[in-house]
A protein has these predicted regions:
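Active-site helical microenvironments for divalent-metal-assisted chemistry
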Residues: 1-146
């Protein structure tokens, strides 16, 4: 099976009941849009597969070991690089983002841009939206400055 298609199947299964912050949109559309953005810059199937899978370890019970077994070291290493424990502060996330490899940075930049696009429809209080927008703007600047 094609690596990108396999990644899409895994993402659909892993995020099957999850919704975006609007409470309506299937979550799996997010990693697929991230991968679409990434594919405008690279045709490397490992990188595109990692873009599709960038949230599966962070948000589900999928493991890096399983991804390594199904795919390869490149896909698993990229997903691992992008996986940040939820308890990490935003300041620490900025520091980590500056250390990303070029392909992880490409994925994270598309992830942040997609989250920014979706922000207006999020079912959140205005204060939370404003705070998250500020975080995403700063993250995008950090990713672009490296």
């Amino acid at each position: 099976m094609d690596k990108i298609l396999a990644a899409a199947f895994i993402a659909v299964a892993a995020h099957k009941s999850a919704k975006r912050a609007d409470g309506i949109t299937p979550y799996v559309l997010h990693p697929l849009r991230v991968a679409l953005g990434v594919s405008a810059y690279t045709k490397d199937k490992d990188v595109i597969a990692a873009a599709i899978l960038h949230d599966v370890v962070e948000d589900t019970n999928m493991t890096i070991k399983t991804l390594r077994h199904i795919f390869n070291d490149t896909v698993a290493d990229l997903v691992e690089e992008l996986t940040v424990p939820k308890r990490v502060t935003r300041k620490k996330k900025y520091v980590l983002a500056k250390k990303f490899s070029p392909m992880a940075r490409l994925i994270k930049l598309n992830d942040a841009l997609d989250n920014l696009i979706d922000l207006d429809t999020a079912n959140w209080p205005d204060e939370k939206k404003a705070e998250y927008r500020k975080y995403l703007d700063a993250l995008i600047k950090k990713l672009n400055s490296v």
